[in-house]
Amino acid sequence: MEIKEHIINLPKHIYTGYGILDNFRNYLQTLNLPQPFLVITGPVIHQEIFSKRIEEHIKDFKYEVVIVNKSDLSEAEKVEDIARQKGIKTILGVGGGTVIDIAKFTAYKIDREFISIPTSPSHDGITSPFAAIKGLGKPISIKAKEPLAIISDVEILASAPRRLINAGIGDTLGKITAVRDWRLAHKLRGEYYGDYTASLALMSARHALSCTKIINKDIRAGVRVLTEALISSGVAMGMAGSTRPASGSEHLFAHAIELLYPNLGLHGELVALGTIMMAYIHGINWRRIRRAMKKIGLPVTSKQIGIPDEGIIKALTIAHSIRPERYTILGDRGLTWESAEKIARETGVIS
């Protein structure tokens, strides 16, 4: 099969470990980044992490700080304007998913290097060259800048709220069904499929399953495993040149819920819930996935997230239309109401 050329841009440096923010200055010197920097962060992270753990290591560099509160188009445009006005040469994203998305999208828009400094392991966006920016019509990921380097301090990540950590596990479990959907699209539609990239994504999912076995006993060890899984998943997307290895029917379901109920459930929670049902359709051992989720406290029912049963069914019936060009197990026509209800009930997502 003839494959269209795509350029694979991967992180050149990945720093991970306990307490490594103490080496922040050394990392910046090693990377030899052009200045001035634009540090993009959130209000809480600025106060609790940047001011206390990073600022002293960056004081000899030229930099500006901008605080963001949301990941939407208006916020992204505001940050882009600031970056252009200040003549910014390098973008540093210090925060969770919202901050990282804005940072790498800004870096992409102004064509600058991006350094990812995650403070919560809530999804695989810490590494991937894609960002979830609201206000673009549909809640899907768009092209962004891949990180030149990732600085992931496991001590900081392990101190994130447990719900965010669980969401990261949930997002990573979704690779189980995403890769199956990718294989299906290759078989039925002739879509490009990369064995190595798919294997990398599946390895991330296996790491997430391993994480569910240890994280209740040892949060640091569990988060270390999760962080490696999230990084691997992001790298898989970079190699594929798309989100295909990491996003399939389970993500389409999550995006459908996000459209119907914008403020209910974290992204990773919704992906995990979708993974249970899509695994059922694929004939994968969905009970194992559900047990792993339940063990760590991830929601396994619509009631736990606050979504009405009919909302789950509705999301299942419209999920295929979120990205019509992305073929999945849901097919071109999607699920009927009756089929969707049967799937949701038999997997225990609704009662």
UniProtKB/Swiss-Prot annotation:
Similarity comment text for this entry: Belongs to the glycerol-1-phosphate dehydrogenase family.
Pathway of action: Membrane lipid metabolism; glycerophospholipid metabolism
Superkingdom field: Archaea
Any Gene Ontology biological process: glycerophospholipid metabolic process
NCBIfam families, sorted: PRK00843.1
Molecular function GO labels: glycerol-1-phosphate dehydrogenase (NAD+) activity; glycerol-1-phosphate dehydrogenase (NADP+) activity; metal ion binding
Enzyme class: oxidoreductase
Keyword Nucleotide-binding: no
Keyword Chloroplast annotated: no
Gene name linked to the record: egsA
Physiological role: Catalyzes the NAD(P)H-dependent reduction of dihydroxyacetonephosphate (DHAP or glycerone phosphate) to glycerol 1-phosphate (G1P). The G1P thus generated is used as the glycerophosphate backbone of phospholipids in the cellular membranes of Archaea.
Organism: Sulfolobus acidocaldarius (strain ATCC 33909 / DSM 639 / JCM 8929 / NBRC 15157 / NCIMB 11770)
Catalytic activity, as annotated: sn-glycerol 1-phosphate + NAD(+) = dihydroxyacetone phosphate + NADH + H(+); sn-glycerol 1-phosphate + NADP(+) = dihydroxyacetone phosphate + NADPH + H(+)
CDD domains reported for this sequence: Gro1PDH
EC numbers, comma separated: 1.1.1.261
Keywords carried by this UniProt record: Cytoplasm, Lipid biosynthesis, Lipid metabolism, Metal-binding, NAD, NADP, Oxidoreductase, Phospholipid biosynthesis, Phospholipid metabolism, Zinc
Quaternary structure (record): Homodimer.
Protein name: Glycerol-1-phosphate dehydrogenase [NAD(P)+]
Taxonomic lineage of the native organism: Archaea, Thermoproteota, Thermoprotei, Sulfolobales, Sulfolobaceae
